[in-house]
Amino acid sequence: PLFALILYCLLTLEALCYKASKEKKEWGKLLENLFWVGLVGALIALIFALTQAKKVLKFSEGTELMQKLAASIRKGANAYLKRQYTTVAKIFIIVFVILLILAGVGMLDNWFIPFAFLTGGIWSGLAGFVGMKIATSANARTANAAHESLNRGLNVAFSSGAVMGFTVVGLGLLDVSIWFHILKYIAGFEAAQIAQTMVMFGMGASFMALF
């Protein structure tokens, strides 16, 4: 998934920077710059997603019948999400507890691993929630806009799709950037330990995506 790809790219870039740096001060400065680039990029992506969502919601949902159909779809989608996330939350708690036990008996590298798995799932679930909300809000608006003109319909459709896309990228970058900062500057981990821990973030996100 995209979360895992972002993680891989950041760690690869980290390794290249370390290899290219001859002095420790330069290495630290490069890492600090990378952290801020990732964080700023995440915020830009999330802000852009918000602006696109507001843009979509400004369009009309069309006739009264279209609005009723859209409301029924949203109601069904909300019921589905509630049932799905309730079930998935129970599974995540079980896996999280198992990982905590494994960390407690020394079978995992560190105590951050269970929490990395958990946050990966939470961010992935949040991205899915946003995607479902914007999709069910855009369907009638897209149909109504397409009735007026093809270009207008495509405009609504692409804007709603951009909300989900940039939300996934923004949340992924944000979580990776925060975890990298915690593991590198607070916990003092080396690159290998960071990679082992942050892989669980990707696993948590992927595990959530299975449902």
Predicted features by range, described:
Residues 2, 7-9, 15-30:
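Short, Lys/Arg-enriched N-terminal segments with co-localized hydrophobic residues
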Residues 30-211:
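Hydrophobic, small-residue-rich transmembrane alpha-helices and their short perimembrane loops
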Residues 3, 12-13, 22, 75, ...:
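Alpha-helical structural elements
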